[in-house]
């Protein structure tokens, strides 16, 4: 899954902190294989979250955790994220 978040003007630092808090919690979830956060070099305040889970069930469990609920509640005040800024992906098998 990839999520894109653009910080509201003047709130990039606060959004960055919320993302860091979320990452610290999510990385400890048993079904989380990868949770990496990035900030665009050319667009300060634009963040990308890259997440990989062991299974669809692990991702569903992740969505029910308190840190995720807290993050989702905080995002509207800090970000201009729109529907479609979250993309679920399936890996292409090579070989």
What name fits each language-model region?
Residues 10, 42-44, 54, 66-70, ...:
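Short alpha-helical
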Residues 48-50, 63-77:
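Long, charge-enriched, surface-exposed interaction segments in small proteins/subunits
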Residues 20, 28, 63, 70, ...:
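A beta-strand edge to alpha-helix "cap/lid" segment located at domain peripheries
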Residues 11-33, 67:
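Short amphipathic alpha-helical segments
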Residues 4, 20, 24, 60, ...:
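Solvent-exposed, non-membrane alpha-helical residues enriched in polar/charged side chains
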Residues 1-6, 36-63:
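Short, well-ordered beta-strand segments in beta-rich or mixed alpha/beta enzyme
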């Amino acid at each position: 899954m990839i999520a894109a978040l653009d910080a509201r003007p003047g709130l990039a630092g606060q959004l960055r902190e919320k993302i860091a808090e979320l990452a610290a919690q999510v990385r400890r979830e048993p079904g989380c294989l990868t949770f990496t956060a990035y900030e665009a070099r050319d667009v300060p305040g634009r963040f990308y979250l890259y997440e990989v889970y062991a299974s669809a069930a692990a991702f569903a469990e992740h969505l029910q955790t308190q840190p995720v609920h807290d993050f989702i509640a905080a995002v509207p005040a800090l970000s201009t994220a729109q529907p479609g800024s979250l993309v679920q992906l399936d890996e292409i098998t090579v070989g």
